[in-house]
């Protein structure tokens, strides 16, 4: 995991360790908020060969995953770069998990578990809502019945996560409000948990206090 401000400018340096040709699974909303070029420019500067898959309008469903998987195989990619929120990251995870398998997405949704080595997956989250980033199970929509199913993937499928705080700061106001509310709920849930400790309570209380400052429109989070 790489954390920090403007670390996305070095993403091309990181991905070079995993190959030279990639498929970039990107949330189309990033173009609207001016983040797409910010992420792709470092790849262009270091001549990283890539193509973009951004047809994510219907969520992480099996049809889009099947389409992305076919494009990845036809493009002989050596890795997947996922940019965006949970939707983009889940689709990219499914493609990486299935790339070297002889069966498809619907076999996995019906219970078949991938066993071959997954394609290297590099994630660049643009939100803090990434609960399945390092989880061997991801939720997907089965287009046959329009129901959410859990797909098992290989452990440690995400080889690298580049988390840049400036990407989150560029979100729309509605996205920021949604993320803030969910994060506040997580803090409250953790505080009330039976597994809570003195230290976890301290972090939860401090996070709730900081959110209070932020939601009140404070220019500074200094307490």
Positions of PLM-derived features:
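N-terminal loops that bind phosphate or other acidic moieties
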Residues: 44-45, 74, 95, 112, ...
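Active-site segments that bind and position negatively charged phosphate/pyrophosphate groups
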Residues: 190-223
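A glycine/threonine-rich phosphate-anchoring loop and its flanking beta-alpha core
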Residues: 100-198
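ATP/NTP phosphate-donor binding region
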Residues: 1-79
């Amino acid at each position: 995991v790489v954390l920090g401000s403007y670390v996305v400018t070095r993403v091309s340096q990181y991905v070079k360790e995993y190959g030279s040709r990639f498929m970039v699974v990107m949330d189309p909303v990033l173009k609207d908020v001016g983040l797409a070029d910010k992420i792709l420019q470092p790849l262009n500067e270091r001549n990283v060969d890539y193509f973009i898959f951004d047809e994510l309008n219907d969520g992480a469903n099996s049809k889009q995953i099947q389409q992305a998987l076919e494009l990845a195989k036809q493009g002989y990619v050596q890795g997947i770069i996922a940019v965006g929120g949970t939707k983009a990251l889940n689709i990219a995870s499914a493609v990486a998990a299935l790339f070297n398998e002889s069966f498809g997405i619907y076999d996995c949704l019906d219970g078949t578990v991938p066993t071959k080595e997954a394609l290297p997956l590099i994630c660049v989250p643009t939100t803090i809502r990434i609960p399945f980033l390092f989880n061997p199970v991801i939720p997907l929509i089965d287009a046959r019945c329009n129901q959410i199913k859990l797909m098992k993937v290989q452990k440690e499928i995400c080889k690298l996560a580049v988390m840049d705080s400036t990407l989150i700061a560029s979100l729309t106001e509605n996205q920021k409000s949604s993320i803030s509310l969910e994060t506040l709920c997580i803090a409250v849930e953790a505080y009330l948990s039976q597994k809570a400790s003195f230290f976890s309570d301290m972090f939860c209380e401090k996070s709730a206090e900081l959110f209070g400052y932020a939601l009140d429109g404070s220019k500074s989070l200094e307490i």
